Design a protein with these regions (language model features):
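ABC family nucleotide-binding domain
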Residues: 2-219
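Conserved switch/coupling elements of ABC/ABC-like ATPase nucleotide-binding domains
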Residues: 220-225
Length: 225
């Protein structure tokens, strides 16, 4: 099966004054196309750092990243990295990161504005993905008028509007109660199965991780399973 993310010998060291902290140590990982992968481990073990490196939001201190068959040159400009992210990756975060002054429709459109998509096409595509996440009746609402689960649905709609091949989710149910968390997991599974979309999810929830295709565990920056 095709590999869409390949990490080879990834190390990440944070330096503050004279103190060095190794967040990741010699990580070697392949993610297959269409896979739903969970990354688990205690707080501070490097899970989110790993996801940020996969998502080209952070650079490793050493090691190689390959994304959809393309080796990522560490000398790539910020603009080129942003272009790759916008084309290939969708991001879902624990804290939603919605713009509070914009309604649902406008929040979901944002990635297409950065791509230069025309207004009419943006609105059409935004309405399609909003309907898909079950929020057509909330299109004109702002985030403060929505529940936590609804805000996360908006964030997922925004993440998939550009039809990215890979969805990276950092604790997507972490701020939700168990019922809303289960609904978000059901939505993610639907996106995985119906679209063949690759999903990499960081989670503390063992029950939710057990529903995915594969679990990778980290401890102190090292992959242990």
């Amino acid at each position: 099966m095709e590999t869409v993310i390949k990490l080879t010998g990834i190390n990440k060291i944070y330096r503050t004054d004279e103190v060095e902290t190794q967040a990741l140590e010699n990580v070697n990982l392949e993610v297959r196309k269409g896979e739903f992968l969970s990354i688990m481990g205690p707080s501070g073990c490097g899970k989110s750092t790993l996801l940020n490196i996969m998502g080209l939001l952070d650079e490793p201190t050493s090691g190689e990243i390959e994304l959809c068959g393309m080796k990522i040159d560490p000398k790539l400009s910020d603009n080129r990295l942003a272009e790759l992210r916008n084309k290939t990756l969708g991001f879902v975060f624990q804290s939603f990161h919605l713009i509070p002054t914009l309604n649902v429709l406008d929040n979901v459109q944002l990635p297409l504005i950065y791509r230069g998509v025309r207004s009419g096409e943006r609105i059409r595509l935004a309405k399609e993905v909003i309907e898909r996440v079950g929020l057509s009746h909330r299109m004109k609402h702002r985030p403060t008028q929505l529940s936590g689960g609804q805000c996360q649905r908006v964030a997922i709609a925004r993440a998939i509007i550009g039809n990215p091949e890979i969805l990276l989710a950092d604790e997507p149910t972490g701020n939700l109660d168990s019922k809303m968390g289960a609904e978000i997991m059901e939505l993610l599974h639907r996106l995985n199965k119906e679209d063949g979309r690759t999903i990499v999810m960081v989670t503390h929830n063992e029950q939710q991780a057990a529903q995915t295709d594969r679990i990778i565990k980290f401890l102190d920056g090292r992959q242990i399973m």
